[in-house]
Amino acid sequence: MEKFELKESATTPRILINSKKGKIKLIGTSTLHNPEEFYPKVLNIAQKYFDKPLEETKVTIDLDYYHQNSFNYIFQFIELIVGLEKFKRTKLKMMWHHHPLDQGIAEDIALISKTLDYQIPTMSYELVS
């Protein structure tokens, strides 16, 4: 698999896994009614990259909203990504973008960072109309 891309919808995030360039993106909203039917398939596809990662992997996360059921799978996804660097299988360049006033996402990032003992870099932004 060189590239897997799932376009964003009203309830699913855009997911990009580009094995040739070492890029992973998770962008948008995740409010699926049945994330247990969606995310395991995505994790299986991602595992193909995780089995043979490039020397450097660039990860961009920009989720503007997700519910708790999706969060559990997002956590698993990030845990696998962070594991690549912890086991020295890739040099990880990760950035999680979020709105500065979104306390829920900021708290989730802090929780994931603490749980995985890995400081996830963040960048806050404000949408300009």
Indicate where each model-derived feature is located:
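STAS-typified acidic loop motif
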Residues: 2-40
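Glycine-rich, often proline-containing surface loops adjacent to acidic residues and nearby aromatics
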Residues: 21-25, 55-60
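A cross-taxonomic marker for long C-terminal extensions/tails that follow the last structured domain
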Residues: 2, 107, 113-129
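Amphipathic alpha-helical interaction surfaces in cytosolic regulatory modules
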Residues: 37, 42, 58-112
